[in-house]
């Protein structure tokens, strides 16, 4: 039987000096929580992490996650053996004297680690000081997905195994579990949230729609964010397929993409553009506009050719619902736009036949397009939660299985 690895507490701060925080130089203790700007303040100006979607919540659990005034996040160390094990993992990967190529590569897929932090009033309360992956986003859409066929580690008791299996019996077959999500809806300027009960309700038949919900902003499916997420996951998969040092249990992927946008022109100009191009083509009520950086706005012209340029931000944005995706170089997704001469669905029509509801919807969609769109969406996918990571001499088949199935689900969302 395998023996559990030791978990020494190596207190060090491998991050850059400006991000290292020593308890001795923290500001004056604030004592009990006090309201500040509508948010409760804890521990030297720290506040509960507002955009947390899963895991231990500060104020609800004995341990939780806080936001430090410098923009980092503080994850309170869990009780032994989980907390010391996670601390050991971060110290091992981010050790200054680490020359292991596998671990150096792994750093790319983790939040940056800046050592440990503790408040002067409670020096024994240890927190992992980590990068806030959502920090650069204005309206971050966030999803936490537990990866692997088993959510319990090799040293779990029979009671623990039974408990974990009963929470989500499909874990072994599906290979991942949505623990929570927070999606920004542009039309209402608000967030839709789902917790772990939502993820546990998903079956083999509904998992695709359940995941795609994270990429829908209330107007359209963010296929650009889906495609970017696939690319990120594939890099993590490649790392797992080439390492036999570590096995991960009950670990997650954190997905983040930008949900907000800024208008490239005024509403009036966007409406004018919509009227101009829609007046030359037909868009039925059943057809769906989908949000993708590689799409084009199609319109009928005198010679039947395509592309209507609507500015740099719009010209590569939209197409009809009927699209063809092909896989290139491990799911590099490209779009084949049909020539209108071969597409009888687009028929010339006069302005009076324009559906007012469609035009109104287009105005809103155009207005909420992101500016300065790149070829691929700004997306972060990072590995988190390492309280159950163990040394190994074999490929982590359970994690690999989960990644592959998640990629398959995301591809099916693109191809549908």
UniProtKB/Swiss-Prot annotation:
Motif Nuclear localization signal in this chain: 320-330
Compartmental location: Nucleus
Protein species of origin: Homo sapiens (Human)
Phenotype when changing residue 196 to A: Decreased enzyme activity
InterPro entries, per the entry: IPK, IPK_sf
Activity modulation comment: Inhibited by flavonoids that occupy the ATP-binding pocket. Inhibited by myricetin, quercetin, luteolin, kaempferol, isorhamnetin and diosmetin, and to a lesser degree by rhamnetin and apigenin.
Biological process annotations from GO: inositol phosphate biosynthetic process; inositol phosphate metabolic process; inositol trisphosphate metabolic process; necroptotic process; phosphatidylinositol metabolic process
Stated name of the protein: Inositol polyphosphate multikinase
Classification via Pfam families: IPK (PF03770)
Main subcellular location of this protein, as a coarse class: nucleus
Family affiliation: Belongs to the inositol phosphokinase (IPK) family.
